[in-house]
Every structure is written in C-alpha cells, then in structure tokens.
C-alpha cells in the first residue's frame, strides 16, 4: 500500500527576520504562532505552522548558496509513525539515507537531500491536535531548544517493530538514548 504524505510547511533562512515575518503576514494573511529572536513560525490555517523563518543569531548569512538565504526545506507529513518508518525502510533499501534525523518534540522528522541538494523533510506530528503542538512549542523543553536532538532512524524502526510504545518513541528523551550527531551542522552543509 502506498501512503501519500501531505505538505506540512516550508522554512526560509533570512538575514531580515522582521521584514520577512511582516511580508508573510501581509501576503499570506498568516499569523504568528511562535517566535523568538532567531525564528518565527506562522500559519494560515489550523496547522501549528506552515511557514517558518530562521534568522541565525547575529545574522550575517551570505547571499544564497545551498546553506544560506532562501528555501531551507519542504516538509511532508505522514499519518502515522509506522508509515514514516515504512517509508524510511523503503528509501533505505534503495540507498537513500536521511541526511539528518531530528526529534523536534513537535514532530519526529527525517531530513533528506534531493539530487540537487534541496532538503526535504518527512515527518509525523507528535501531537493529536495543532493546539497541543502549539502548547508544546510554548513549553520549557521547546523554548530551551527549538531544534531538538538527533536520533538513529534504524534504532527507531527496530524499537517500533519490537513494540516500544509510540508515545515513548516520539519523545526527545528516547531520541537522546541514541547516538547523537550535530543537527545544525548536518542541516547547513551539502
């Protein structure tokens, strides 16, 4: 059975966070769901965010290269953790490995680079409703670390198949039990 994911959000890196935030508010009629000095999440509907803007502390991003100003990634949401794991295993069997797996807390995410180097995120929402996701984003765990730790996707697949509860596997606490990589370094390099 083929599962078709749905588009979740896109992320843009910018040196002009306030101006970009206002532009998306004006152009899309979006509203701010969460923001801090380095990022802003906006939405136009019931989703916790459709547009994310990231302006690294201190700014100074050079003009567009694969790791600077412009589209950072597109994201697609799968209905269940099992569906995401199945897709991971299908891609792995074809030699397509995630560039970086991240337990954001609000989502469990696998980031891939396409042949041109564009980042594509395959994810599941870790909460049943957008309101729960938004509440989490305003909580201490998320505001302390908005990105989250990496995780080992094969270990996730094995734990899922072994019957470890999904409610445990979709937490940062579980992700931190696996080997860690530098998430931001992996996201910002080709």
UniProtKB/Swiss-Prot annotation:
Coiled coil: none
PROSITE patterns to which the protein is assigned, alphabetical: EXTRADIOL_DIOXYGENAS, VOC
Domain VOC: 6-125
Catalytic activity: biphenyl-2,3-diol + O2 = 2-hydroxy-6-oxo-6-phenylhexa-2,4-dienoate + H(+)
Cofactor(s) for this UniProt protein: Fe(2+)
Enzyme Commission designation: 1.13.11.39
Position of the signal peptide: none
Listed CDD domains: BphC2-C3-RGP6_C_like
Keywords, comma-separated and alphabetical: Aromatic hydrocarbons catabolism, Dioxygenase, Iron, Metal-binding, Oxidoreductase
Gene3D superfamilies xref list: 2,3-Dihydroxybiphenyl 1,2-Dioxygenase, domain 1 (3.10.180.10)
Protein name: Biphenyl-2,3-diol 1,2-dioxygenase 3
Gene Ontology terms, MF aspect: biphenyl-2,3-diol 1,2-dioxygenase activity; ferrous iron binding
Pathway(s) this gene product operates in, as recorded in its UniProt entry: Xenobiotic degradation; biphenyl degradation; 2-hydroxy-2,4-pentadienoate and benzoate from biphenyl: step 3/4
Subunit structure: Homohexamer.
Transmembrane segments: none
Residues noted as binding Fe cation in the record, renumbered to the chain: 9, 73, 121
InterPro entries on file: Glyas_Bleomycin-R_OHBP_Dase, Glyas_Fos-R_dOase_dom, VOC, Xdiol_ring_cleave_dOase_1/2
GO BP term (any one): catabolic process
Family: Belongs to the extradiol ring-cleavage dioxygenase family.
Recorded superkingdom: Bacteria
Disulphide bond pairs: none
GN (gene name): bphC3
Pfam families: Glyoxalase
């Amino acid at each position: 059975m083929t599962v078709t994911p749905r588009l979740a959000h896109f992320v843009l890196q910018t040196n002009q966070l306030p101006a970009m935030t206002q532009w998306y508010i004006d152009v899309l009629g979006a509203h701010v769901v969460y923001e801090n000095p380095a990022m802003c999440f906006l939405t136009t509907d019931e989703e916790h965010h459709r547009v994310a803007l990231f302006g690294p502390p201190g700014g100074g991003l050079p003009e567009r290269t694969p790791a600077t100003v412009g589209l950072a990634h597109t994201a697609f949401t799968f209905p269940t953790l099992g569906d995401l794991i199945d897709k991971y295993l299908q891609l792995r069997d074809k030699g397509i490995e995630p560039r970086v797996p991240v337990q954001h807390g609000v989502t469990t995410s696998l980031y891939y680079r396409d042949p041109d180097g564009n980042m594509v995120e395959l994810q599941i929402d870790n909460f049943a409703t957008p309101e729960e996701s938004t509440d989490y984003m305003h909580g201490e765990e998320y505001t302390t670390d908005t990105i989250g730790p990496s995780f080992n996707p094969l270990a996730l697949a094995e734990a899922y198949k072994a019957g470890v509860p999904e409610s445990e596997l979709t937490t940062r606490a579980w992700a931190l039990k696996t080997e860690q990589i530098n998430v931001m370094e992996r996201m910002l390099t080709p």
